[in-house]
Amino acid sequence: MDFPQQLQACVEQANEALRRFIAPQPFQNTPLVEALHYGALLGGKRLRPFLVYATGEMFGVCRTTLDAPAAAVECIHAYSLMHDDLPAMDDDDLRRGLPTCHIKFGEANAILAGDALQTLAFSILSDAPMVDVPDRDRLAMVSELAQASGVAGMCGGQALDLQAEGQQVDLQALERIHRHKTGALIRAAVRMGALSAGERGRAALPALDRYAENIGLAFQVQDDILDVVGDTATLGKRQGADQQLGKSTYPALLGLEQARKKAHDLIADARRSLDELAAQSLDTSALEALANYIIQRDK
């Protein structure tokens, strides 16, 4: 199976898991749950669930066991996009080629649906079946996702990003923003996949952390590049939005070609981390394919 097929299989698996976890929620057919469903299943690449599945399967964990952490991390990602798109933050009206949640359902419902997705993520991790995953590792996943999505991770990074609008920041400050805003949740996805494998997965965490940190930053560099060279129809969101908001970006700081070089260098570092795991007879091909995809994608 080539990488596009692998990614599509992950999209289908993750979407089915999300539907399964959303279906028992009360107040179906109300604007709140309709907005929740819309925000969670609006489309998207499902890269974070892919990282959960690919990492866990590398250690022989059954894919159905990985549905819970994969769906949980996507719930957090989806809620963050719903809130990022609000007028008080990035003020976007287009997401994945469709109206953003607050445009379709109103700001109040978008906020509440985002809140509900955040809490659903932790409900899934706490209660969903995970065959052969001890309580210790389940609790570790809860902690990982909480740290990655809160002040120490995604929310902290978003706050730094908002504070930096209209200001010139240096490369170190920009990397600090994105290691939190984007990278923390990517790292959590990889770590949750590893934790599902118990001690074998825990032993691999140092190499996996380096891999995740490098692809997380490369993902943001590529996003910044696409904001310059992409088009709205392909991206599914406003092209040039970062410049309009006065955000510092890697192309603005480094120039377009040096930004591309930085993305490639980060992916090369990520591959070197995988070499350590391949030397232990682990099949890292899916994680390597994702790393390559990050700098080849056009949306």
Place the predicted regions along the sequence by residue.
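N-terminal amphipathic/basic leader segments beginning at the initiator methionine
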Residues: 1-22
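Structural helix-adjacent loops and short alpha-helical linkers that scaffold large soluble proteins
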Residues: 7, 200-203, 278
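Mg2+-dependent prenyl diphosphate-binding active-site environment of isoprenoid biosynthetic enzymes
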Residues: 12, 22, 26-273, 283-295
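Generic C-terminal helix-cap and adjacent flexible tail
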Residues: 276-279, 296-299
